[in-house]
Amino acid sequence: MPRIKQTEKSYFCYMTENRRLQAEKIISVIILVLLSAIYIACICARAKAAASPKPDFTVVIDAGHGGIDGGVSGIKSGVKESELNLDISRKLKTVFEKSGAKAVLTRKTEAGLYGIFSKGFKKRDMKKRMEIAERASPDVFVSIHLNYYSSSSRRGAQVFYKIGSEKSEKLAISVQNQLNALQNKNYAPLPGDFYVLNESSGEAILCECGFLSNEEDEAMLLTDEYRQKIAETIFVGIETYRYGLATGVN
């Protein structure tokens, strides 16, 4: 077996060591690139989070009725309360979202929340609404409805609040004040024994936005412009309460 000369052996060792060092450099570069990529990704994620802060206020908007339960009907047009409730609720949601708040609808379409229509559908519908509301952990819960009364002369909006809740009463006062100003009325908010209010964990109100038994209220509520005003007025009332600017009933 031929013997490897010392110079050849040294050269071989040199080449082996050189390759090892080159491999280590390549691995170091790869690790550096990966760490840099991770660092940049973290910076981008933080920047994105800072640019899109989590909303610090959540409102759940409950459009009353829906599906087989259309609510009351317009005295002249026959329009279903559920349709107008949903439109006002959608408008209110849009206004809140434009302000940077999070707004959640319990009902997004004309369908009810009771599943298959059968005995006990109303109770299932109400329970589903509250499940949606509780998952959202809202600061405020507001249910949108329209009223009906035996006397067709009665008109204007009426706000109800969760019984035994001082904060809900103050919220109702603030919203009622704004609606009174819009409709030139002087109503005071009332305690309301309603399932959606009783089952709410926080501040909760129910807004009867007008009387479909009154032709003037009905005619206004049939216009998109007035429904937008109603939504904006409720928004202002809630925001006034939120920032501690509400006073007594005007």
Task: Kindly give the residue locations of the regions a language model identified.
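N-terminal Lys/Arg-rich, disordered targeting/topogenic segments
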Residues: M1-E24
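Active-site-proximal helix/loop segments of hydrolytic enzymes
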Residues: T16-I30, A37-K54, V79, L86-N250
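Alpha-helical structural elements
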Residues: Q6-K9, L34, P189
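Extracytoplasmic glycan-interaction modules
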Residues: P2-I4, L84, A101
